[in-house]
């Protein structure tokens, strides 16, 4: 295991803010298929599928780990699809031997002490969202490894907030609710026009529970984002891989764009409440800033 957790705020405020200071923008939420594509299939594996936490490694004294990944997987935001003609090749991270080895590091700083995600049976290797052009519909997908491989892969309790459904096609109604982190995004603080203190940046995830057994969990190298379209779990048995969630009773912790950590009541993230508060706070440019109280 590498370094114990200092909590959600440390991952975002210290590491992502340092990334922004160096690069003048936030890291991408993940490197997925073309976000403007006319169709979506998470199982096509046509992208690097590297998530936001990987880009933060150099800012948490893990430059060597980042270098070993980037030697095998091209992390250029502008190279879409699989391209073996570039150096390094644009390929899914798990096709690189070094990258696959690095992904098995159990990163203590990405884990919440309140949740035992190491018991998960299947570890997500990539996650992505998509919105159908000229509509109000969309979807998300997760693919991962089970068995001994899934147990060996490093896991995370923290993911970047994609807003309602991520940075979908601008003709999709969900585009209004895009968040700080998305598919190949490079937003800066100025993009948070709702105010950095009013926008979710990172949040807690637990994976899925089925009959009190943790099934799907999220791998830190490939899983980068979580949308808010599917609300929050009201009770522990409602925890799912497609929602933020925590094992803290009745609440989920989020790190806001300014680095402050706020507790959000789970009952405010379901039913009509998600439209009144949860989804608007997850969006950074929807001109709606409801109170966290």
Language-model features, listed with the residues they occupy:
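Single conserved hydrophobic/aromatic residue that forms the stacking wall/gate
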Residues: 1-12
């Amino acid at each position: 295991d590498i370094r114990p957790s200092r909590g959600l705020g440390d991952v975002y405020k210290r590491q992502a803010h340092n990334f922004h200071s160096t690069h003048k923008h936030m890291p991408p939420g993940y490197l997925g298929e073309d976000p403007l594509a006319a169709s979506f299939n998470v199982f096509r594996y046509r992208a690097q599928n590297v998530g936001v936490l990987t880009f933060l490694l150099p800012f948490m004294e893990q430059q060597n780990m980042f270098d070993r990944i980037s030697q095998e997987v091209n992390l250029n935001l502008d190279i879409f699809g699989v391209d073996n003609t570039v150096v390094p090749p644009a390929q899914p991270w798990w096709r690189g031997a070094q990258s696959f080895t690095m992904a098995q590091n159990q990163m203590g700083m990405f884990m919440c002490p309140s949740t035992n995600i190491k018991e998960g049976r299947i570890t997500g290797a990539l996650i992505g969202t998509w919105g159908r052009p000229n509509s109000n519909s969309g979807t998300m997908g997760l693919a991962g490894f089970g068995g001994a491989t899934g147990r060996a892969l490093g896991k995370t309790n923290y993911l970047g907030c994609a807003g309602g459904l991520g940075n979908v096609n601008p003709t999709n109604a969900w585009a209004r609710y895009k968040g700080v982190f998305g598919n190949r995004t490079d937003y800066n603080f100025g993009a948070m026009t709702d105010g950095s203190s009013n926008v979710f940046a990172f949040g807690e995830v637990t994976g899925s529970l089925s009959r009190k057994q943790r099934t799907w969990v999220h791998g830190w190298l490939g899983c980068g984002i979580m949308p808010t379209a599917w609300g929050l779990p009201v009770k522990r048995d409602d925890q799912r891989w497609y929602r933020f969630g925590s094992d803290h009773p009745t609440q989920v912790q989020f790190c806001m764009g300014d680095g402050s950590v706020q507790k959000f009541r789970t009952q405010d993230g379901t039913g009509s409440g998600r439209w009144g508060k949860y989804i608007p706070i997850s969006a950074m440019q929807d001109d709606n800033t409801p109170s966290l109280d």
